[in-house]
UniProtKB/Swiss-Prot annotation:
Active-site positions on this chain: S162, D303, H334
Gene Ontology annotations of biological process type: lipid metabolic process
Signal peptide: none
EC number: 3.1.1.-
Protein name per Swiss-Prot or TrEMBL: Putative esterase slr0264
Bilayer-spanning residue ranges: none
Length: 369
């Protein structure tokens, strides 16, 4: 009998079962393999088949410049995917995002990928730091409005994975509440919530406080946290070089953990008193019951980055979810979902990236509805 934890959402058809290679059967192994092997493989594959993106600077909320890659507009496009990545990285090095965009384009969706705040080339353009969705959610809406003005067809779908998944959840929420915050901005006057189709979030961060406490309480988790913190510190020094005088070098020196990065560099700029307050107000978990647009949330029960209690609680929220299609798999790791050969064949997928093809199947289903 199927476990209730793994029951498919009633809002979405049951998916083919995900099965990894035997050597990636643990969430930690899958996560490390994805970071050190699969990402580069995705990048190599995407470079040969992705659309010829046009690099452009668009405008986000608060006038923040955002670096984007936008695809040529294909004939008979089904809609437009606007997507970004996780806590660290850039458009140049995110293989999973590039493959997602490549396969979406092959399925006749327009694609806009972007470096979110304080990342990639966006970090060269602006000293504005991250807000974990509070303003990035609005950024998605601003990008969609500008894409519409350029001739990109709706509906507009917001996508992300890991922390980017949290951002996409904020994006769809901000999109459906546009009237509450748009303030008659001229850039948004020809855009409305009806232009937005929904969102897709793969292994999103839902409760940063609990997950960070969980990570730092285990030896392996501390290793993962330290690796991310080192990347964040590199990011801070890059911002310091690009924008002299904007950042206190001593504050950057003190930012030796994820919590330290947010404490020393982020919360004051957002007017928040503590990191705990920041994580509470930016958490995506309370948003799930408020989202009414079709939104896919794909989550692996063995994701080593998140507190295991979260995945145990999610099925209990089903009755509160009006727009969210919750899909929980027993395996998959953190943004891994590398399928073995039989799994790939059973799903008739063109490559091993199971999550990419399931999300696009879901998108096709919603586009036909």
């Amino acid at each position: 009998m199927r476990s209730p934890l793994l029951a498919p959402s009633e809002k979405c058809q049951a998916w083919p079962r995900f099965t990894p290679p035997w050597y990636l059967s643990s969430g930690l192994a899958m996560t490390l393999y994805t970071a050190f092997v699969a990402n580069q493989r995705c990048l190599n594959s995407a470079r040969t088949r992705e659309p010829e993106y046009i690099s452009q600077v668009m405008t986000g909320s608060q006038g923040v410049p955002l670096h984007v890659w936008r695809s040529p507009i294909p004939s008979q496009a089904k809609g437009t995917l606007i997507a970004t990545y996780g806590i660290t990285g850039s458009l140049e090095d995110q293989g999973f995002l590039r493959q997602w965009g490549r396969w979406a384009y092959e399925r006749h969706y327009d694609v806009i990928l972007f470096d979110w705040r304080a990342h990639g080339k966006t970090a060269e353009l602006s000293p504005t730091l991250t807000s974990d969705g509070l303003y990035e959610g609005e950024d998605f809406v601003y990008l969609a409005a500008q894409a519409k003005a350029l001739g990109y067809p709706g509906p507009f779908w917001f996508g992300g994975y890991s922390l980017g998944g949290q951002l996409s959840l904020w994006g769809v929420y901000k999109g459906q509440t546009l009237a509450d915050w748009g303030n008659n901005d001229a850039m948004l006057t020809s855009f409305s919530p009806t232009d937005i189709g929904g969102a897709m979030a793969i292994c999103p961060s839902l409760d940063s406080q609990r997950s960070l406490n969980y990570l730092t309480s285990h030896p392996v988790g501390r290793y993962l946290e330290k690796a991310i913190a080192n990347k964040l510190k590199e990011l801070a020094w890059q911002l310091h070089r690009h924008h002299p005088g904007e950042f206190d070098s001593q504050a950057i020196e003190r930012a030796n953990t994820i919590w330290g990065f947010d404490h020393n560099l982020v919360i004051d700029r957002l007017g928040l008193a503590s990191v705990e307050d920041y994580y509470e107000v930016s958490s995506a978990l309370p948003l799930l019951s408020k989202i009414v647009k079709p939104t896919l949330l794909l989550y692996a029960a063995d994701d080593p980055m998140f507190h295991p209690a979260i995945v145990e609680e999610l099925p209990g929220l089903q009755n509160q979810l009006t727009g969210v299609d919750l899909q929980i798999t027993p395996k998959g790791g953190h943004v891994g979902y590398i399928a073995n050969g039989p799994c790939q064949q059973a799903s008739n997928d063109p490559d091993e990236n199971w999550a990419i093809h399931r999300t696009l199947d879901w998108l096709d289903q919603k586009s036909l509805a």
